């Protein structure tokens, strides 16, 4: 593999790792929001609220994949 290809491969791998880290942060944030009410107290959110957060997460996740 020549040096240009190696550099591109290293940049791609670095970007991929960063995106995976960003996706985990977003996923964790949506999970946290789904489990809290407006006062920040843990609550048993009904399924429709949880579904809404999951739907938003899926849209964001899908938008990230479209850029590749």
UniProtKB/Swiss-Prot annotation:
<dbReference type="GO" id="GO:0019828">
    <property type="term" value="F:aspartic-type endopeptidase inhibitor activity"/>
</dbReference>
<keyword id="KW-0062">Aspartic protease inhibitor</keyword>
<feature type="compositionally biased region" description="Basic and acidic residues">
    <location>
        <begin position="33"/>
        <end position="53"/>
    </location>
</feature>
<comment type="function">
    <text>Specific and potent inhibitor for yeast aspartic protease A (yscA). The proteinase acts as a folding template stabilizing the helical conformation in the inhibitor, which results in the potent and specific blockage of the proteolytic activity.</text>
</comment>
<dbReference type="Pfam" id="PF10466">
    <property type="entry name" value="Inhibitor_I34"/>
</dbReference>
<keyword id="KW-0646">Protease inhibitor</keyword>
<dbReference type="GO" id="GO:0005634">
    <property type="term" value="C:nucleus"/>
</dbReference>
<dbReference type="InterPro" id="IPR019507">
    <property type="entry name" value="Pai3"/>
</dbReference>
<dbReference type="GO" id="GO:0010951">
    <property type="term" value="P:negative regulation of endopeptidase activity"/>
</dbReference>
<protein>
    <recommendedName>
        <fullName>Protease A inhibitor 3</fullName>
    </recommendedName>
</protein>
<dbReference type="GO" id="GO:0005773">
    <property type="term" value="C:vacuole"/>
</dbReference>
<dbReference type="GO" id="GO:0007039">
    <property type="term" value="P:protein catabolic process in the vacuole"/>
</dbReference>
<keyword id="KW-0007">Acetylation</keyword>
<dbReference type="GO" id="GO:0032991">
    <property type="term" value="C:protein-containing complex"/>
</dbReference>
<dbReference type="GO" id="GO:0004866">
    <property type="term" value="F:endopeptidase inhibitor activity"/>
</dbReference>
<feature type="region of interest" description="Disordered">
    <location>
        <begin position="1"/>
        <end position="21"/>
    </location>
</feature>
<comment type="similarity">
    <text>Belongs to the protease inhibitor I34 family.</text>
</comment>
<feature type="compositionally biased region" description="Polar residues">
    <location>
        <begin position="1"/>
        <end position="14"/>
    </location>
</feature>
<feature type="region of interest" description="Inhibitory domain">
    <location>
        <begin position="1"/>
        <end position="32"/>
    </location>
</feature>
<dbReference type="GO" id="GO:0005737">
    <property type="term" value="C:cytoplasm"/>
</dbReference>
<dbReference type="InterPro" id="IPR008956">
    <property type="entry name" value="IA3_dom_sf"/>
</dbReference>
<dbReference type="GO" id="GO:0002020">
    <property type="term" value="F:protease binding"/>
</dbReference>
<feature type="region of interest" description="Disordered">
    <location>
        <begin position="33"/>
        <end position="68"/>
    </location>
</feature>
<feature type="modified residue" description="N-acetylmethionine">
    <location>
        <position position="1"/>
    </location>
</feature>
């Amino acid at each position: 593999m020549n040096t240009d290809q190696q550099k591109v491969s290293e940049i791609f791998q670095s970007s991929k790792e960063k995106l995976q880290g960003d996706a985990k942060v977003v996923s964790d944030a949506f999970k946290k929001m789904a489990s809290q009410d407006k006062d920040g107290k843990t609550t048993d959110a009904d399924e429709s609220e949880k579904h809404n957060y999951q739907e938003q997460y899926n849209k964001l996740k899908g938008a990230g994949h479209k850029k590749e």
